[in-house]
């Protein structure tokens, strides 16, 4: 019985994660400054499985309303590369207006990162309607006091 209990405790803790084991790990929660975004401040969460989430206030764009972003990332040497996508809705008609994909590349330095990001826009049929040149992207890790 004790062995079974010990096994159950070990298995339940197997999925638990603490702070990143590497000081330059992207895994964690970040306050992000994207100077070219309609609303420049965002929250990013990078998960250990290569997925990520993005959120920011919806008030930055008067024409479209956007969802939270969901995306993917990979380590490439000492750099992080990734992309997230959000759904766009027309504020007047309340209809699907397309998507925006934001590609990024950055380098993590302990509790900060610096890099660039570049958006691409797609209409409701999935046809690219525009893109922008890369602009600065910086982040500060959310830490406990």
Predicted regions and their residues:
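Positively charged n-region of N-terminal signal peptides that target proteins for export
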Residues: 1-4
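C-terminal motif of bacterial Sec signal peptides marking the signal peptidase cleavage site
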Residues: 12-15
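Bacterial lipoprotein signal-peptidase II cleavage site
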Residues: 17-23
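Tryptophan-anchored aromatic micro-motifs
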Residues: 23-39, 71
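N-terminal glycine/threonine-rich, aromatic-flanked beta-hairpin/loop signature
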Residues: 40-81, 86-87, 112-114
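Hydrophobic/aromatic beta-strand elements that line small-molecule binding cavities or substrate pockets
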Residues: 42-46, 69-74, 99-108, 118-119, ...
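Edge beta-strand at a domain terminus
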Residues: 77, 119-145
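Acidic, glycine-rich flexible loop segments
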Residues: 83, 88-110
């Amino acid at each position: 019985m004790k062995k079974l209990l010990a096994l159950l405790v070990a298995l339940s803790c197997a999925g638990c994660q603490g702070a990143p084991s590497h000081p330059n790990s992207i895994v964690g929660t970040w306050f992000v400054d994207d100077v070219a975004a309609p609303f420049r401040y965002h929250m990013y969460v990078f998960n250990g499985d290569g997925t990520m989430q993005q959120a920011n206030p919806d008030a930055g764009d008067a024409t479209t309303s956007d969802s939270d972003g969901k995306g993917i990332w990979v380590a490439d040497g000492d750099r992080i590369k990734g992309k997230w996508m959000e759904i766009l809705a027309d504020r007047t008609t309340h209809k699907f207006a397309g998507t925006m994909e934001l590609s990024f590349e950055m380098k993590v330095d302990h509790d900060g990162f610096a890099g660039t990001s570049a958006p691409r826009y797609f209409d409701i049929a999935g046809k690219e309607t525009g893109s922008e040149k890369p602009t600065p992207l910086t982040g500060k890790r959310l830490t406990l006091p």
